[in-house]
A protein has these predicted regions:
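Eukaryotic tandem repeat interaction scaffolds
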Residues: 110-171
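Ankyrin repeat A-helix N-terminal signature
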Residues: 9-14, 43-54, 81, 85-92, ...
Length: 231
């Protein structure tokens, strides 16, 4: 007898042939969701595995009517779509690329790729139209998220793609202010300086990043203040 539990394992195992047979016999199980709102497509995408089998499984479920943009749950404008699951949990670049080729919106997933330190997927999302400074997370750009999580590889990828290094978060700080508070290494400040970060923007406490840098003991940090852009 087929149960939701056994079907869950079939989906997570990307056993697409078996899944097709089960759903042909029990079409009433197609639209089942778990306690977090995830359907079978979300679970398929969230589970790491063989790329080819995961793509066949996803195509089967899409062909049976599950939605490419259907969200398991939402937070404001942000949505946990199948694409997001393929990137955040599945870490499955080929599946993510396949979903994008099918027309999946490249929204909501940049932060997941940043958290995973996955610059290749960041570039993939941008190539399919993701906005480098998207605002799906209230008050925080992807670049700000990269700095907050000390993901400076992704930060470099975003800056190279044109991310604005001078945005201000809801607290009133720029990325430079955040890095000063975190004690980030000087090479990360130099990265931002190379991409036009301004040192003359007041932060939450009214001080500019340049003025804070000039008070540092390390002469390299003091010198960096003069490398920062100004209005």
């Amino acid at each position: 007898m087929v149960s939701k539990t056994s079907l869950r394992e079939t989906v997570r195992g990307h056993r697409w042939r078996e899944l097709g047979e089960v759903l042909a016999a029990r079409p009433d199980l197609l639209n089942v969701r778990d306690e977090r709102g995830r359907n079978w497509l979300h679970l398929c995408c969230a589970t790491p595995g063989d790329p080819a089998d995961s793509i066949r499984t996803a195509d089967l479920l899409l062909g049976l009517g599950l939605g490419l943009e259907d969200a398991a749950f939402t937070e404001g404008e942000w949505k946990a779509t199948p694409l997001w699951f393929s990137i955040s949990w599945g870490k499955n670049y080929p599946l993510a690329e396949h979903l994008l080729k099918l027309g999946a919106a490249p929204l909501y997933s940049l932060f997941a790729a940043i958290w995973n330190n996955d610059s290749a997927t960041i570039r993939l999302l941008l190539a399919y139209g993701a906005k480098v400074d998207e605002d799906s997370a209230p008050g925080e750009s992807p670049l700000m998220g990269a700095v907050a999580w000390s993901r400076f590889g992704p930060a470099a990828t975003l800056l190279e793609a044109g991310a604005d290094p001078n945005l201000v978060n809801p607290k009133g700080d720029t990325a430079l202010h955040m890095m000063l508070k975190k004690g980030s290494a000087i090479e990360h400040f130099r990265l931002f300086a190379r991409h036009g970060a301004r040192g003359d923007i007041p932060g939450a406490k009214g001080e500019t990043a340049a003025s804070i840098l000039r008070r540092k003991r390390d002469p390299a940090f003091r010198a960096l203040a003069d490398e920062l852009a100004t209005a």
